[in-house]
Amino acid sequence: MNVRASLPAKSPAASGRRATLHALVAAAIAGALPLAAVAQAVTLLTGRPSGVHHPLGVALGTALRKSLPSFKPSVKGTKGTAESLEELQQGRAEIAFSLGDTLSDAWKGREDAGFRTPLDRLRSIGALFPNYIQVVARADAGIRTLAGLRGKHVSVGVLKSGIELDARAIFSAAGLRYASFGRIEYLPFGESVELMKNRQLDATLQSALLGVSGLRDLATSVDIVVIPVPAEVLRKIDTDVYLPAVIPANTYRGQTKDVPTVAVQNVLVTHEGVPDDTVYAVTKTLWTSIGELTGAHPAAKAMDPTKALAGLVIPLHPGAERYYRETGVLK
């Protein structure tokens, strides 16, 4: 049965109301109408309230309210990125923050990442800033390379979490399997750090901003080594998701040289059902409010509109595409 054909057609009145609403939003954005002439409810999903995305979502909501008083943004926390993306797919929100690796898994419907079917209604608004994959070992464990992890006691993050899936990809590309390690742990980052402090764990990894507090704290307690993720490893993994990156010298105590690694983008996401004019307005407000976002969290210092398309793993929403064409980011 053709499900699409069997759906009831929209009434002329409903279609007319929708067209009128879109026209009002477009006119308000263009300045042809008072911004109060149309009201738009916009729900922003920010993941866990303790995470980086939550203060940025609050700041973006405030910026939307200021620049477009007709918008009625609300910020909602979720259990994490996966839940946020599922909510978007179902049309229960308009905007969400995500990491590029999780977004790629959602788009593909990767079952071992917790997605039973592809979330094919998702669309990108733009790449915000990178998370760096940071592999660290206790200096006295004698580990200097990924190969040196063989036979060691390693924590790879919570099973099936984003970082654990990153660990699988990176270690596999380096010729390592979990069976290669002397002992494997599936622990949250905080617990892994505490075990390393107590010399009960040799190494761990995290996907985080540079200078993440947990690693700074670890480096003040024990001597650490930041393990390189070399270019040949990057070439063997999904280069649509992972980007070449560098952890600059002196990011952590005792780290005297730049260390190559890979990074994944933080991405602002919407879904195909959100009107083009709404997404255009959100995209414009996002990139003209970097100062306000930086005030909410220093991660926004790395935001650069000229890099908004780097590392995107799903299609752009047409409303975002329009903004990038107008500003010359997209030719």
Predicted regions and their residues:
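An extracytoplasmic/periplasmic, membrane-proximal ligand-sensing/linker region
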Residues: 187-191, 197-199, 208-226, 232, ...
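Extracytoplasmic small-molecule ligand-binding "clamshell" domains
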Residues: 55-59, 65-88, 254-256
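Bilobed "Venus flytrap"/periplasmic-binding protein-like clamshell domains
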Residues: 42-67, 71-72, 131-198, 310, ...
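Pocket-lining segment of extracytoplasmic ligand-binding domains
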Residues: 100, 111, 141, 177-269, ...
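Sec/Tat signal peptide C-region and signal peptidase I cleavage site
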Residues: 33-39
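A structural signal for short loop-to-beta-strand junctions that line the ligand-binding cleft
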Residues: 114-128, 133, 251-260
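N-terminal secretory signal peptides and thylakoid transit peptides that target proteins
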Residues: 6-27
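Ligand-binding clefts/hinges and TM-proximal coupling segments of bilobed small-molecule sensing domains
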Residues: 152-169, 241-312
